[in-house]
Amino acid sequence: DLALTLVTLAVGATMVLTYFVPYVDPGSVWFFPVLGLAAPAVYVASVVLMLYWIIRWRWVCAGAMLVVVVAGVFKVSLFWRPEIRRSYATETAFDRAAVKVMSYNVRSFYGEDGRSSVDDILRLIEEQAPDLICLQEFNARLAEQSEEFSLLGEKYEIAHFGRTQAPDSVYGSTLTILSKYRILRSDTVLTPSSSVWADVIVGEDTVRVFNNHLRSTAINASDNQFITSHQFLSDTARETKIRSIVTRLRENSVLRAAQVDSIAQVVGATRTRRIVCGDFNDTPVS
């Protein structure tokens, strides 16, 4: 039991640390962003160890893990939110004054197979008929070639922003806000590809709509294959791969935190009603 006791201590300590992830600047403690990714697995491990010690009647270890597990109960919904009694047979009825908002990273209108998905996505928007739309990685060139987009433009006012000039931007994507309400003005918070806003008139109110696309984790297809399939690599190659992934997670978490600070200042200083949308590229525990 000594080995499992040590494992329990390690898992319990790690679980406690995950509770502090949202409150610690990624730039000050480098491993906290990685803990955020591991939080669901650590929580499951904590539950398993708690049950093990209960079965063994080791109440000190069981009690310690029970405290850790109970402390995390309210965070479980961040990862898993079962809707056992929800029915999809009927649509939810909304108040007539409700505003329907859609936020969608359209990935430059390219699907997983590399083919254009612009018409499919625009048809989905047409079917859902949202009042406000925030699109990330919007490819203006492909959109403007689509007849569906022309039809969409007849129903929505569109706030266009400049194209991304980043060297890794293959398709020149940017952020776009579409509104069935009149757009008064629009501007950028950081860059046209990371954070923008538009003021729209909803009834008698001015509402500022923020559209954000924060720094990604930079985890690519090769990294996903390595993580999910336990791809066989030599010890040296495995160490290099893990070091590369962790380094990118850390560096991009720091950059993302700086973006959040800048955006939060602008959102906080906004005197009108606000709607904040976007692809935030982070874990629920962040």
Regions found by a protein language model. Give the residues of each.
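Transmembrane alpha-helices and immediately adjacent membrane-cytoplasm interface residues
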Residues: 43-88
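Membrane-embedded alpha-helical segments of integral membrane proteins
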Residues: 6-57
